């Protein structure tokens, strides 16, 4: 089994998700949802290739992989015997821009 290590940004992301959920839905729902995210992340220690590579899905040169965990994308990379959790981002956010500084193409670009 591989060791899982969280980046400071990933820990901050989880705290922000907790804060949002707590304000919107209360403690019970928050605890249940965070446990689901952590459970999915833990599966990576046994199945590190479970996630999809960003390069596979978006054709972007990146070593990051991701999994979907309870309405969030968990971005990680494999470093020797370590799974490094890079970010945990709400699926509705512009994660490519946040993670890699890449703006997705828009329909406006097609009109030019």
Spans of model-derived segments:
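A short, surface-exposed loop/turn module that caps and links secondary-structure elements
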Residues: 42-68
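Enriched for short, Lys/Arg-rich terminal
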Residues: 72-112
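Arg/Lys-rich, positively charged N-terminal/basic patches that mediate binding to nucleic acids
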Residues: 1-36
């Amino acid at each position: 089994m591989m060791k899982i290590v969280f980046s400071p940004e990933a820990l901050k992301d989880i705290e922000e998700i907790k804060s949002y959920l707590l304000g919107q839905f209360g403690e019970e729902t928050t605890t249940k949802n965070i446990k689901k995210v952590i459970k999915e992340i833990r599966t990576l220690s046994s199945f590190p290739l479970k996630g999809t590579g960003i390069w596979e899905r978006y054709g972007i040169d990146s070593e990051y992989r991701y999994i979907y965990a309870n309405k969030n994308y968990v971005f990680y990379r494999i470093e020797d015997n370590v799974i490094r959790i890079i970010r945990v981002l709400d699926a509705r956010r512009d994660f490519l821009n946040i993670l890699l500084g890449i703006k997705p193409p828009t329909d406006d670009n097609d009109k030019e």
